[in-house]
């Protein structure tokens, strides 16, 4: 019987109940895989990526022992979106001027002229 792949997809976060093998997602109910900013809307530093990964690990740990459902994955994804917004507002993260579509999905950049 094939395993069901659960997923959460938000604007900047994708979470799958899968592992990556040869660039393919293989369903795995015991593992969550995080795909961060698939459209490359932001410029990421290693420290910001680590901060997101740490928050992801905290959220997963807080749901340990609970039901693995679409709803719980969406809660984790929404929390990560909020973390991304906070990082952007704090100036730790910035929009990528080279992205395919620059739509400022999390609000206009904070610049001295706009403050």
Curated annotation (Swiss-Prot):
Origin: domain of life: Bacteria
Keywords: Membrane, NAD, NADP, Plastoquinone, Quinone, Thylakoid, Translocase, Transport
Reactions catalysed: a plastoquinone + NADH + (n+1) H(+)(in) = a plastoquinol + NAD(+) + n H(+)(out); a plastoquinone + NADPH + (n+1) H(+)(in) = a plastoquinol + NADP(+) + n H(+)(out)
Any Pfam family matching the protein: NdhM
Bilayer disposition of the protein: Peripheral membrane protein
EC number(s) recorded for this UniProt protein: 7.1.1.-
Principal subcellular localization: membrane
Keyword check for Cell wall biogenesis/degradation: no
Keyword Zinc among UniProt keywords: no
Subcellular location: Cellular thylakoid membrane
Cellular component, GO annotation: plasma membrane-derived thylakoid membrane
MF terms (GO), sorted A to Z: oxidoreductase activity, acting on NAD(P)H, quinone or similar compound as acceptor; quinone binding
InterPro entries tied to this protein: NdhM
Enzyme class, spelled out: translocase
Function of the molecule: NDH-1 shuttles electrons from an unknown electron donor, via FMN and iron-sulfur (Fe-S) centers, to quinones in the respiratory and/or the photosynthetic chain. The immediate electron acceptor for the enzyme in this species is believed to be plastoquinone. Couples the redox reaction to proton translocation, and thus conserves the redox energy in a proton gradient. Cyanobacterial NDH-1 also plays a role in inorganic carbon-concentration.
Family designation: Belongs to the complex I NdhM subunit family.
Complexes and interactors: NDH-1 can be composed of about 15 different subunits; different subcomplexes with different compositions have been identified which probably have different functions.
Record's protein name: NAD(P)H-quinone oxidoreductase subunit M
Organism encoding this protein: Prochlorococcus marinus (strain MIT 9303)
